[in-house]
Amino acid sequence: VTDKRYAQYFGFTEAEAKAVLEYYGLKLDEEVKAMYDGYHFGKEEIYNPWSILNYADTGELAPYWVNTSSNKMIRKAMEGRDQAFARGYEELIEKGKLETLVRMETSFFEVSSTESLWGLFVNAGYLTIEKVISARDGRYVLRIPNEEVQQEFRDLTASYLNVSESDLSAMINGLRYEERERFAQSYAD
């Protein structure tokens, strides 16, 4: 996912997404971009092809990516994680991005370290690389790529924190609007 030579094989470029949508009488507007764009492969902006094709077919802006697989693998990998992962995850949710060490060459069966888990998140499409700090050292800035995946993150986060989605929304709003007491109350409930 970091090699620009292969970027075009991971999804649609903007020109390709635009051509597909125009063929079906749809436009590639800001709302579509916010929902399905946001992946970075190499230095290329890439759209989720599954979601673009489903949107072209139905004309309905909806989260199609979540239906491609279960997030059970990610949930299982997150179980029993150490404080380093918990702090990083909280920063990601609070700030929308995270600078961290990432081990890209990993599989589900090798997720023994926090760096490997972040690599699994990237390789599974939950996160994208916003910026390469040091490829040699494996240091990247990661972020949630788009609104479609953000919706899935809400469910994943509720499960990780063992809270309801409504409590999670209250917690996130407390963080977002710097209402620490509101966040603490939601977390305590």
How should these model regions be labeled?
Residues 1-189:
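Phosphate-binding site recognition
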